[in-house]
Curated annotation (Swiss-Prot):
Tissue note: Expressed in the lung, in the ciliated cells of the airway epithelium. Expression increased with differentiation of airway epithelial cells. Not detected in the mucous cells. Expressed in ciliated cells in the oviduct. Also detected in stomach, colon, prostate and liver. Expressed in breast, ovary, prostate and liver cancer. Expression is associated with the level of differentiation of breast cancer (at protein level).
Span of the signal peptide: 1-21
Primary residence: endoplasmic reticulum
Induction: Not induced as part of the cellular response to endoplasmic reticulum stress. Up-regulated by androgens and by estrogens in prostate cancer cells Up-regulated by a hormone (estrogen-receptor alpha) independent mechanism in ovarian cancer.
Keywords: Endoplasmic reticulum, Signal
Name of the coding gene: AGR3
Higher taxonomy: Eukaryota, Metazoa, Chordata, Craniata, Vertebrata
UniProt cross-references to InterPro entries, sorted A to Z: AGR/TXD (IPR051099), Thioredoxin-like_sf (IPR036249)
Protein name, per record: Anterior gradient protein 3
Source organism of the structure: Homo sapiens
Homology family: Belongs to the AGR family.
Role summary: Required for calcium-mediated regulation of ciliary beat frequency and mucociliary clearance in the airway. Might be involved in the regulation of intracellular calcium in tracheal epithelial cells.
Length: 166
């Protein structure tokens, strides 16, 4: 009798937990296709030209993330970028955001070569800020997961430079 009750209770718990898991999954928004996993709550522009237009119009800096789906370094950076609340909040509210899986015709976005991941900032006057760099001398604009504090600092620097130049 007790075994029968315990079995019934287990079955009930499994049913409730699986229904709860289904309900939680349904609550999640479908991924925004333009985010490509970098942050579904961020409004992403589709093209570099669109990004430049909105940067100039809104007086916000444009942050351009070059990456590839099959690059382990891009994937590792994307994972921590998407999970970092401070980065997501700044990206969502203070930047025009673009992530690209192909190169643009603007050679200013690849001052030291075409590699991924690469993050560049463009100010509202449409100047590529080559002075905002990462920590690696051989790939100035790349960031690794452990470099998030530097990326956050560089995002803040991009915002400060705009304030001081307006």
């Amino acid at each position: 009798m007790m075994l029968h009750s315990a079995l019934g209770l287990c079955l009930l718990l499994v049913t409730v937990s699986s229904n709860l898991a289904i309900a939680i999954k349904k609550e999640k928004r479908p991924p925004q296709t333009l985010s490509r996993g970098w942050g579904d709550d961020i409004t992403w522009v589709q093209t570099y030209e669109e990004g430049l237009f909105y940067a100039q119009k809104s007086k916000k800096p444009l942050m351009v993330i070059h990456h590839l789906e099959d690059c382990q370094y891009s994937q590792a950076l994307k994972k921590v970028f998407a999970q970092n609340e401070e980065i997501q909040e700044m990206a969502q509210n203070k930047f025009i955001m673009l992530n690209l899986m192909h190169e643009t015709t603007d050679k200013n976005l690849s001052p030291d070569g075409q590699y991924v991941p690469r993050i560049m900032f463009v100010d509202p006057s449409l100047t590529v800020r080559a002075d905002i760099a990462g920590r690696y001398s051989n790939r100035l604009y790349t960031y690794e997961p452990r470099d998030l504090p530097l990326l956050i600092e560089n995002m803040k620097k991009a915002l400060r430079l705009i304030q001081s130049e307006l």
